[in-house]
Amino acid sequence: NKSRKRRNRESLLGAATVEPPKPIPLTWKTEKPVWVNQWPLPKQKLEALHLLANEQLEKGHIEPSFSPWNSPVFVIQKKSGKWRMLTDLRAVNAVIQPMGPLQPGLPSPAMIPKDWPLIIIDLKDCFFTIPLAEQDCEKFAFTIPAINNKEPATRFQWKVLPQGMLNSPTICQTFVGRALQPVREKFSDCYIIHCIDDILCAAETKDKLIDCYTFLQAEVANAGLAIASDKIQTSTPFHYLGMQIENRKIKPQKIEIRKDTLKTLNDFQKLLGDINWIRPTLGIPTYAMSNLFSILRGDSDLNSKRMLTPEATKEIKLVEEKIQSAQINRIDPLAPLQLLIFATAHSPTGIIIQNTDLVEWSFLPHSTVKTFTLYLDQIATLIGQTRLRIIKLCGNDPDKIVVPLTKEQVRQAFINSGAWKIGLANFVGIIDNHYPKTKIFQFLKLTTWILPKITRREPLENALTVFTDGSSNGKAAYTGPKERVIKTPYQSAQRAELVAVITVLQDFDQPINIISDSAYVVQATRDVETALIKYSMDDQLNQLFNLLQQTVRKRNFPFYITHIRAHTNLPGPLTKANEQADLLVSSALIKAQELHALTHVNAAGLKNKFDVTWKQAKDIVQHCTQCQVLHLPTQEAGVNPRGLCPNALWQMDVTHVPSFGRLSYVHVTVDTYSHFIWATCQTGESTSHVKKHLLSCFAVMGVPEKIKTDNGPGYCSKAFQKFLSQWKISHTTGIPYNSQGQAIVERTNRTLKTQLVKQKEGGDSKECTTPQMQLNLALYTLNFLNIYRNQTTTSAEQHLTGKKNSPHEGKLIWWKDNKNKTWEIGKVITWGRGFACVSPGENQLPVWIPTRHLKFYNEPIRDAKKSTSAETETSQSSTVDSQDEQNGDVRRTDEVAIHQEGRAANLGTTKEADAVSYKISREHKGDTNPREYAACSLDDCINGGKSPYACRSSCS
């Protein structure tokens, strides 16, 4: 029978007519020739290349060429000593349209039915038996150079699939697949695997296998393909696709991992790629390779250095041991497959089994996409992934899925977990939790953190409620039964809040409800108990998340955490308690520093806007390098008429800011009552520019009753006078060539320029690029933020409300009439810096008086020129002192004490008191300079006779 079958096979082969296969043309991105010069070759390699080229020429694989295309060619020597010719086709591949793979993945030999006989064959020189399309041959030309160019180079082009061409594997699979299609149709009950040029045939009986193989030989030969006779396998053990196949078992082929070559990222990437390829056979869980996977972190440069750690060395040893001992099983085609899910450490592990026979392992990637992945979601993802794998292997869903959950937990998972619904969508099999009794799974390291045990999804009854908060200043805090503020090194509000939650979990060893205004922290705390934490390049974040997970898992009592929106106006105790926690970490000082860095607002403005002390506000200004250098000197006291209400009297001038370029003419207007400033940058200072500026002022400040300017031509022209008359505005000018008449606006010019310099050289704002934008920022600071001495509101508030809120307004005072040299009683209308406006009486015009010619009126008054008593004067002094302190005046306490001691001597005249005060001051100071320490000579001095620095000179 055997001889008869052999003769039948031979006759069948002899009768077959070989038809040349039809070539598959390539698609090109360009028809422009690609030419890469051939590099010189050593004499030995050049001789070998000539021999190989002649051999391929005789076989008809190449032909002479005059193609404008060229690719370099070279040879390598095999271990056997034979030479192999290769072509560098990288440049040509770049202009070929890819066909795409026909087999995205290797077939699994575990699907070969157990106990079926096998035959494995290898096609000989498969690429060289498949022709190229005629129009494509010239694209694969190469050149064999001559030494010293002593003769013309020899050029050839490929007529068959060249090795290294982008689409050669796809074309090869297509040709072999066509040849095997008749075999698959005729022997549909046989199991045939084809991968590139390796073919495996399995049949239920040997006779059927021989018949199938005989027919396969004929079809392969008919397609112009040849079987390598020395690579036919007919007995166990079979070697196929890196596996050793036996009648029932499948083992990985024995390999040795070379550790001495592992030096770069590329080396470790290749190693782990190979290990991952055989992991479904080896059964190495993800947690057992975590140190090897960790080596891949860091620099993405393939040549970046990497080092094999002792922990990773142990894991490689485990891989080698598994290669020696691991095995899987061939399946029974009539029995269903099952999926087992084990709750292993790090991430779950899946196993495909048939009865108790292991078919394949399934794992999740070591790194996840999300920062936190719940363990239940990982189980669902693994189920969905392995279901697709089983369908790919055998075309069917698993018959049963075994999970480490109770029936109630499975029911809750279907209700609450979206990932669970996706992973088990359309599954009609059995979901069970009873594992088969076998020892092959006992080595797995299991975890108990599958579902939350400590974290609750609903508020706890009869539990403490704690509110947490964190700030970007590094402070974390909680409030509840007790309050605590924690200083952290973090500059992130979320990280500080994370520290606050961790501290609460550590401090309260009892059931608690935590309320946080960070949704990010709340979600992280809810998930962290059973989550796989994704590795981050930020070590601080890794440490915080790991500490949070450890803290939660160590707790003995449950907790609930929820989110509350911060800074809302909602009523109720929760909002108030959250605000209390926010107050513990919010820093008005930091906000004040940030505003000053942006606008360079003065100390009074900072104190008014933020809850900071005078010292803190002054420290901010004093520590600012720009404000320290550009601090304006104290202006000498004097009188310049001012308005008694907003828009009563303006002063206007033009100053120059060279840095503004062609817009360097800055027109400035200041309201003399509120000190509200408005300025515009113009290209000149003519009447048209002045009118343009005033219209801008009207839009912001309103229309004034009176404007005072200098005698510039733009202000004295008839056109300007006509413009003012249209708006019903009266106009006055100062003394020509005397700037003192315009002292207020001149001072404003200096203030505005100084503010511009501060913000330009020391400001944090980078968006103020145009001159007008720079002006607007300076004006905003001066009008809406700064508060000046003797005032309690900003210039903008004074201008809009008409209220200055000076503490001396409405008070009775004595004022000195310099014409008559007498002291009169009046009432303060407004009080400014070094000046005051006094009402002498009914039906009399107000009088502007320097503050050195004023004193407070106190009842009873015996003599307007003499002090009433030491007690009265002391009371007056304390009143003024209190006001000075409010205005930020820094007094020398020792001098104050000296002058008070002199006043309290109860002498008959002020001169005698001054003499005593002067004497004490000299003795105390050890200084003989009478001008510096002499007390004020005016009885009832407005400064209490004790502040020569404020008086500057004798009040009389």
Swiss-Prot record:
PANTHER family, per the entry: ENDOGENOUS RETROVIRUS GROUP K MEMBER 10 POL PROTEIN-RELATED (PTHR41694:SF4), ENDOGENOUS RETROVIRUS GROUP K MEMBER POL PROTEIN (PTHR41694)
Identification of the protein by name: Endogenous retrovirus group K member 6 Pol protein
Gene field: ERVK-6
DNA-binding region: 811-859
Functional note: Early post-infection, the reverse transcriptase converts the viral RNA genome into double-stranded viral DNA. The RNase H domain of the reverse transcriptase performs two functions. It degrades the RNA template and specifically removes the RNA primer from the RNA/DNA hybrid. Following nuclear import, the integrase catalyzes the insertion of the linear, double-stranded viral DNA into the host cell chromosome. Endogenous Pol proteins may have kept, lost or modified their original function during evolution.
Metal-binding is among the record's keywords: yes
Domain (RNase H type-1): residue spans on this chain: 460-590
Organism: Homo sapiens (Human)
Listed GO biological process terms: DNA integration; DNA recombination; DNA synthesis involved in DNA repair; DNA-templated DNA replication
Record field: catalytic activity: DNA(n) + a 2'-deoxyribonucleoside 5'-triphosphate = DNA(n+1) + diphosphate; Endonucleolytic cleavage to 5'-phosphomonoester
Positions that bind Mg(2+) 1: D469, E497, D517
Top-rank taxon: Eukaryota
Residues that coordinate or bind Zn(2+): H596, H600, C624, C627
